[in-house]
């Protein structure tokens, strides 16, 4: 069959038209598929974050195994209680600090998670437990499908919480430090023989109550402690915990606050 020149032109136009339509539908289909995938990813992230909450991880059996092991290690070494009661208190207190300061619900949830996980490293060794705990938390959070930016925020806070090597550098690390260092109370002492108390036992046993209060108007965060001075004087308390108090001062500054320590109604720092 022979084609005339005009026929070849018409066929060429037809092919161009078909190719153009094909490209249009291809691009349109790709766009729709991309939109659907992005929507599914967003939904998946939302689903993960709904599951990845302080309340949920607090009931994660595998996580609690390591926290319990860490507490047993510290018990054998003569340390105060570092059980889930401590980590839960730190989680709740840290969350309250950021909530009081107006941070969004997501930030509050992240600091609660960091607070609950912060002592994981004690299951390996008390020495450098902040860093080993951060690495352990990384694996848990990655396995649970947490977004990288959330994992980074949580493990950074955990890695900075120990006074021997850490420093507050952002709201999460600051709130975690303040919550952890303010958990001073009599029932953390496991030693039942007062004559054999070490300095930490003595301070904790002397603490009849301790409360952390945030005054957003005056921009002050105050640790109020009621001490039994027959066991530990206010000056002794400050001397023993001076490094921790300096860490709290820095943490408060990161949050735009001043740190105050009040014992039995008297300002110590």
Stretches with model-predicted labels:
Residues 2-9:
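Extreme N-terminal basic, low-complexity initiation segments
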